[in-house]
From Swiss-Prot:
This is Small ribosomal subunit protein uS3. One of its GO terms (cellular component) is cytosolic small ribosomal subunit. Coiled coil: none annotated. The keyword Metal-binding does not apply. Keywords: Ribonucleoprotein, Ribosomal protein, RNA-binding, rRNA-binding. Binds the lower part of the 30S subunit head. Binds mRNA in the 70S ribosome, positioning it for translation. It comes from the Bacteria. The lineage of its organism: Bacteria, Pseudomonadati, Pseudomonadota, Gammaproteobacteria, Lysobacterales. One of its GO terms (biological process) is translation. Belongs to the universal ribosomal protein uS3 family. Residues 214-239 are annotated as: Disordered.
Length: 239
C-alpha cells in the first residue's frame, strides 16, 4: 500500500512541509499557481548545473521569497553575484512582485533523494551499467549515515527490447510509517533507447515533533508508556 500514494503528499503536515506557502482568494489562486510552476520550470532549466534539490516559494504581502537548496551554490550566485541579480529580475517579471532569493547549500548531496536520482540518471545517460550506478549511490548513502535507501529504475535497461523495472535496497524504508522522515526524488534519463525513470527513497529516521503543525516533542519513555497502556487495554478487552 505504501507505493500507491506520493510519499511526500501523504506526509504533509505530519513529517513533511509544503514547497509553496501563501494564501489567495479564488480570483488570485490560479495566477499564483501558474507563476509558481513557471518559476520552478525556469530555475530547473536555467540552473540545471547547480544541482537543485528543492525550491521553496513564500509570498508575504507584496513580495516573494524563493529559497533554493542546491549542491553547488557558486553556479547560482555567479561571479560577484551578477548571475543571481539577473535571475532575481527575471523572477520578478514572472511573479509581478519584488523577489528575494535565498541560496542554501546542500552539505551532503549523497543523502538528498532528488540529487541522488539526478546523479543516477546522468550516469545512465553516460552509458554506465544501471546496477553499478544504483549500488554506488546506495553504498555512498549508507556510508554517510542514511538508515535506509531504495533506488528503482524503469525502462529499456541496457537497451533491452522489452522495458522492465529493477530496484535495489539497503536498510529500512518504512513507507507506511507517517512519522518517518523519508526523502523522495525522481528524475529521467534520456538515452538512445528511450526514457528511463529513476526513483529514490531515503530514510533518515523518525520525526516526533513537527513545528509547522505545533506537535509536541515526545521522548522514548512517553512512547513506551503509551504502548504499554494500549497493550494493557487490549488484554482487558480480550478477557
Amino acid at each position: 500500500m505504501g507505493h500507491k500514494v506520493h510519499p511526500i503528499g501523504i506526509r504533509l503536515g505530519i513529517s513533511a512541509d509544503w514547497n509553496s506557502k501563501w494564501y489567495a482568494n479564488k480570483a488570485e489562486f490560479a495566477g499564483y499557481l501558474a507563476a509558481d510552476l513557471k518559476v520552478r520550470q525556469v530555475l530547473r532549466k536555467k540552473m540545471s548545473q547547480a544541482g537543485i534539490s528543492k525550491i521553496l516559494i513564500e509570498r508575504p504581502s507584496n513580495a516573494a521569497c524563493v529559497s533554493m537548496h542546491v549542491a553547488r551554490p557558486g553556479v547560482v550566485i555567479g561571479k560577484r553575484g551578477e548571475d543571481i541579480e539577473m535571475l532575481r529580475k527575471q523572477l520578478s517579471d514572472i511573479m509581478g512582485v519584488s523577489v528575494h532569493i535565498n541560496v542554501i547549500e546542500v552539505r551532503k548531496p549523497e543523502l538528498d533523494a532528488q540529487l541522488v536520482a539526478e546523479s543516477v540518471a546522468q550516469q545512465l545517460e553516460r552509458r554506465i551499467m544501471f546496477r553499478r550506478a544504483m549500488k554506488r549511490s546506495v553504498s555512498n548513502a549508507i556510508r554517510l549515515g542514511a538508515l535506509g535507501i531504495k533506488i528503482s529504475v524503469a525502462g529499456r535497461l541496457n537497451g533491452a527490447e522489452i522495458a522492465r523495472s529493477e530496484w535495489y535496497r539497503e536498510g529500512r524504508v518504512p513507507l507506511q510509517t507517517l512519522r518517518a522522515d523519508i526523502g523522495y526524488g525522481f528524475s529521467e534519463a534520456h538515452t538512445n533507447y528511450g526514457v528511463t525513470g529513476v526513483k529514490v527513497l531515503i530514510y533518515h529516521g523518525d520525526i516526533f515533533s513537527f513545528s509547522s503543525v505545533g506537535q509536541e516533542k515526545q521522548d522514548d519513555g512517553s512512547r513506551g508508556d503509551r504502548n504499554a497502556d494500549r497493550s494493557s487495554r487490549r488484554s482487558r478487552e480480550v478477557r
